[in-house]
Amino acid sequence: MEFSNQLFMITGCPEQYHHKSLKTGLNILTKKSFDKYGGFILFEAKNIPPYYFGHYLRMVSLPSDRPDLIVYESKQSCRSNMVILGEIFLLSTQHTFIMLNDFGLDIKSISAQDRGKWYECIAGSNSDAIKGHFLFQKTCKASDEPNIIDVDDSNKKYKPEINHLDESNILKRAELLTTVTQSLSTGDAKMAGVIINKNDILDDILTLIIKSGNVSAFKTLINIIGLSNDQIFKIIESSFSHNQTKIYEFLESRYPQLYLESSIINGRTDIVDNLVKKGSNPIVVLHKAAECAQFDIIWNLSENSLINQNDIDIAMTIVKQRIHDILFYSDNPDVEKEQDILELLENIKLMRDF
């Protein structure tokens, strides 16, 4: 098995390993637990069984930098004593299997729709709890601390002190997220606003909506919740990182200046080029790109006729100020990028022959 290929793991609701909770991030079995039960079972997409009990699919990876990693391979799967749980998907939706098809799963013999229906069938009467738990898990961030699992330790003495919500609280919060998301999607702003304010779940709701690309819910949310510029910046960056095109296209129309600035800060050359073509001021873009040391964005402006020598001189002054600040105030005084940009700006002046 090529470990460079994407691996997946099937989990149940709640996500556990022999009654011990799993969590997003690194999970490690004690030696005794690994020897007793054989470890985490991982698959490449092409080897995921057609019918296999579970409720969720996790994208996973192996912590290959750890010397205590153990992996046993077989033809169809591998077993390991530790695993990093990544993004979570519902097995009851055909979209999950369409995604797996892109990773090599053959869905010709059993269609994505039929696979989804089978998993929905095994979910049984707890489908609401399963979907609620899924929504909660999508908002969980990976902890820096590993989750140590000892299946025989009822006192959890081997576990680091991590604050875990108990199962009832998890499901309660998941139900709140489900209710709010549904209310926002249907335009019921009043109910959503009351629940968000009462339960302090704005960040979770934003994360969930952006990851799912739910534009209608997002539009309703920002109409009832006042967002600061910092929050808008984070939302734009998050929509970039999750490649949610419809979300960041809406943000462009709603917050054009913040959208432009965030695109420059994040080095999204393709988006910045498009915004300049649509009419964004290339001089403003040049100076912000100089401030953020975005070489490619500056290079793409090198032949823009609206930029003159004075604009380039100002950009060079901005870069020199950045170099000064890095050398005198930064713990990592590396100014190679800035020196490259100064050289680029000098070359643009020569090329343009002002």
Swiss-Prot record:
InterPro entries: Ankyrin_rpt-contain_sf (IPR036770). It comes from the Viruses. The keyword Repeat applies. ANK repeats lie at residues 201-230, 253-284, 286-314. Keywords: ANK repeat, Repeat. This is Putative ankyrin repeat protein L284. It comes from Acanthamoeba polyphaga mimivirus (APMV).
